[in-house]
């Protein structure tokens, strides 16, 4: 197939508020099973992953992919598919670097849980403990309707009649980690606060920007709704981690997460010698200013907890394997099993399922509460997240399974087909 003759139907929707070493590490560092059957999977059925990816490549929906699966601590599948550069007809590599977008968020979640374990923060802590600007926030509501709720989607050129009311309570770390804070989640308050949230500028810093977010008008009363904050709220937690640890967020994550897990190919800023391994993204029609920031690979000083990482399938599989192991990998314990369970348990009651039936939401990850209702091919209790360009991963404690798919066109059907192919390959 000549991919140049195929259209890649990728579209990336960016909300108004979306602001913004050496050595090759791969999944082979997780030991290979002697056979898939050794860990209760079918070699023949795992081939269906390859068939599914090839089908989508030939259809022109994706340019390529890297897929990886491990069970019971052993690797059973690690394959490259298609092209990392369509114009240059360059084959995908097992160490290709992908733009992770919101797959950055679970890394922030683990970092936050580390501080919870150390007693430096608590989920119930108000954000005003660190930033007084967050003490007396306001909520945008419709007027004259007497209810404290605002529409989630607002045309910034035609803002409806509205009024501001005091927040019923302060927002907390729990609210931000679960996307129930109302901070910069794309509603009326976000539109009214565009100037406070700021533009896309990755030359700023968490220290400068985060206090200004206290001036943002909330989209709803804290704790009353689940609505995704794609690029702002979790940065507040990243800045708190900086304050409590005494080091920049990127250094904390590198020292406390990446280095213990051997994630040597995961960066906000990709070293020059590795930039040839970056996927050349095809089909994303992001506006030029946003694209310049989100795809920047070497010059950022704003180390977001929401987006910005670049990584490989092998590195991210290690991260997921650590979680499915209950917080430990290669003899290095990052979290206790109980803390991982807290992070991966539904913390939002039915607020998330009102948006996505059959699922719950923990601390930065979605949880499978009823896979049938959720139209998932996962086990109840599995958890994970993904990024806007198509990266997706999950950990399944019951099946002792981790799976990662790296693509750079956000095509949900590709993710579903991968998930189905993984699940049907389990034979005990």
Describe each region flagged by the PLM.
Residues 410-428:
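Generic C-terminus detector
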Residues 392-394, 399-409:
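Short, well-ordered beta-strand elements
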Residues 12-23:
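Bacterial N-terminal signal peptides
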